[in-house]
Amino acid sequence: MITGRTALYGVVGHPVAHSRSPEMQNAAFARLGVDAVYVALPVAPERIDEALRGAHALGFQGLNVTVPHKPRAASLCHALDPVATAVGAANTLRRTRDGWDGFNTDAPACRTLLEAAGVVRGSRALLVGAGGAARAAAWALVQLGTEVRVAARREEAAAELCRDLAAAVPGADLAAADFEDLEAEADAAAVVVNGTSVGLPGHEGRLPPLRFRAAQVVLDFVYGDTELARAARAAGARLVSGEQVLVRQGALAFTIWTGQPAPEADMARALEAREGAR
């Protein structure tokens, strides 16, 4: 039951109606008996500054941040954890007296999942995209010791990501790749990561069709039955799904907000239940 004492949490994004975070986080609160509610908050890009101020004024205790707000959210926080600082994007905010502390849970979630999928030091990785999710994936790939090639439709965005991460992480091996050569780059890579919003509801555009092989690891930040995920499964590649990333980063966010270990299995089941009801 929601009362006057119920703590408020939410996710801000544009679009955000598709988000599965409310089911997942509310399942976690219910499992541990936390008096809290988590809601989706649609926020247009030009209104993110006032939205974060307003959420703080309304008493929200924590927020997740999704497309396209992660880089801007980081710049609006009073303090950032080391990973969010290195990545230049924040996807988890925790309330302080005067504002928000920012964290990046996408990056450690990616690292854990990619390592579990068998990514090894010295392997070559293709990262598609240069936004907040791609920056988190770049950090994870660098931490795992891979040679990262970044391809984005805007070449300057890919180059900027490479410069920023190279400055933040000594010894990082990053270079921009030509988006027009995406198919060849994917063929040469042991790891392929989609850090774009292609496949999200409301986002136009497609990636060129990529051919995968069984030895590759493929991570798609976008959850659901995406074209990329279908191609990876058909080829027998080791797929890290958007749902896996969502659960892992969401569990880390839950712990940041509550100080309690997240009931990750319950969170995953909540996503599966929604998928089964569709």
Curated annotation (Swiss-Prot):
Its EC number is 1.1.1.25. Keywords: Amino-acid biosynthesis, Aromatic amino acid biosynthesis, NADP, Oxidoreductase. NADP(+) binds at residues 129-133, 221, 242. It holds the Pfam family Shikimate_dh_N. Shikimate binds at residues 19-21, 66, 91, 106, 223. The keyword NAD does not apply. GO terms for biological process: amino acid biosynthetic process; aromatic amino acid family biosynthetic process; chorismate biosynthetic process; shikimate metabolic process. It catalyses: shikimate + NADP(+) = 3-dehydroshikimate + NADPH + H(+). One of its GO terms (molecular function) is shikimate 3-dehydrogenase (NADP+) activity. Pathway: Metabolic intermediate biosynthesis; chorismate biosynthesis; chorismate from D-erythrose 4-phosphate and phosphoenolpyruvate: step 4/7. Signal peptide: none annotated. It comes from the Bacteria. The active site is at residue 70. Homodimer. Involved in the biosynthesis of the chorismate, which leads to the biosynthesis of aromatic amino acids. Catalyzes the reversible NADPH linked reduction of 3-dehydroshikimate (DHSA) to yield shikimate (SA). This is Shikimate dehydrogenase (NADP(+)). It comes from Anaeromyxobacter dehalogenans (strain 2CP-1 / ATCC BAA-258). The lineage of its organism: Bacteria, Pseudomonadati, Myxococcota, Myxococcia, Myxococcales. The gene is aroE.
